Regions:
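An acidic/histidine-cluster motif and surrounding catalytic segment
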Residues: 1-113, 124-162
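Extended, folded domain segments that form the structural surfaces/walls around functional sites
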Residues: 116
Length: 162
């Protein structure tokens, strides 16, 4: 189950955001492991000021970003299929940064929002991008999940490798 909490008025411009996030997180959960499909995720829709505060407080980076993930449980060695906790964690998405990226990349708002929700969800279950191999694995999985939703590969125009 995904709970969406809107804490910034700017999200009112996109009334379908909650449904987009629900669908994206459900697709990600189902594609990874059946046990995860029943776990809880909270998604906070905030603005650049809100996510900047979170980024500064939790990561020591004093600037806004598009999405942050806060896993509820991070077992040593990473999450394993079948070991999903009841509450996976929280995701925060910043409206202005997300909107700007979508516009700059000529992507529909809903597609980019879906991508960030999937990206954030995968972080909750241990997928990372600290090195090139991890990033490639996560990007491949993101692309597969988004394709299931009818969304084109978000990385296709970047380097032509997907």
């Amino acid at each position: 189950m995904t709970e969406v909490l809107v804490v910034a008025d700017c999200w009112q411009r996109e009334p379908d955001s909650e449904a987009v996030i629900q669908r994206a997180v459900a697709a990600a959960a189902e594609s990874v492991d059946e046990d995860v499909a029943d776990a809880e995720v909270a998604v906070m829709l905030t603005d650049d000021a809100g996510i900047r505060t979170l980024n500064s407080n939790w990561r020591g980076i004093d600037k806004p970003t598009n999405v942050l993930s806060f896993p509820a449980l991070q077992p040593e060695g990473g999450w394993k299929p079948g070991d999903a906790p009841r509450m996976l964690g929280d995701i925060a998405i910043a409206y202005e940064t997300m909107r700007r990226e979508a516009d700059e990349e000529h992507k529909p708002f809903e597609h980019h929002l879906s991508h960030l929700a999937v990206h954030g969800f995968l972080h909750l279950i241990g997928y990372d991008h600290e090195d090139e191999d991890e990033a490639e694995e996560r990007e491949t999985l993101e692309t597969q999940i988004l394709a299931h939703l009818g969304i084109p590969d978000p990385y296709a125009d970047r380097d032509g490798t997907h």
